[in-house]
Amino acid sequence: MLGIDIIKNIRIAKALERFGYHFLNRVYTEYEINLCKMNVECLSGRFAAKEASIKAFSFLSIRRFSFRDFEVVKSKNGIPELRIKDAYINDFLKAQKLKPFISISHEKEFSVAVCYITKEERIC
């Protein structure tokens, strides 16, 4: 399952200007708000990652997802990781041996993200 999203960073800047913390709290977790510190590129990348994740997870037909169902965290080595906030979904993924991965990139005024969900397989 695959989801992709691209966003013009100015859209996030305008949403911040117009709606402020109401927008932030509707889309981002406290961790993400603290991590990005109002950096538009950081917030745009996470927005794109959440949109891509919603698209990828929609193929599972479990339920409808929202932005706050997902949290984009930094791994120990700086790679973005997707954290799912719903215990039921985590249990479902574990039972089906599915693992989501995300990638975020920025180019000039755009941020793009991909989420793909793959079967966990042991190698050996």
UniProtKB/Swiss-Prot annotation:
> One GO molecular function term?
magnesium ion binding
Single GO biological process annotation from the record: fatty acid biosynthetic process
| Main location as per UniProt | cytoplasm
Q: Which Pfam families match?
A: ACPS (PF01648)
What name does the UniProt record give this protein? Answer: Holo-[acyl-carrier-protein] synthase
Q: What is its EC number?
A: 2.7.8.7
Output the InterPro entries linked to this UniProt entry.
4-PPantetheinyl_Trfase_dom (IPR008278), 4-PPantetheinyl_Trfase_dom_sf (IPR037143), ACPS (IPR002582), Ppantetheine-prot_Trfase_dom (IPR004568)
Q: Tell me the residue numbers annotated for binding Mg(2+).
A: D5, E51
Query: Which reaction equation describes what this protein catalyses?
Result: apo-[ACP] + CoA = holo-[ACP] + adenosine 3',5'-bisphosphate + H(+)
Q: Which family does it belong to?
A: Belongs to the P-Pant transferase superfamily. AcpS family.
Recorded GO cellular component terms are: cytoplasm
Keywords from the UniProt entry: Cytoplasm, Fatty acid biosynthesis, Fatty acid metabolism, Lipid biosynthesis, Lipid metabolism, Magnesium, Metal-binding, Transferase
User: Which prosthetic group or cofactor does it need?
Assistant: Mg(2+)
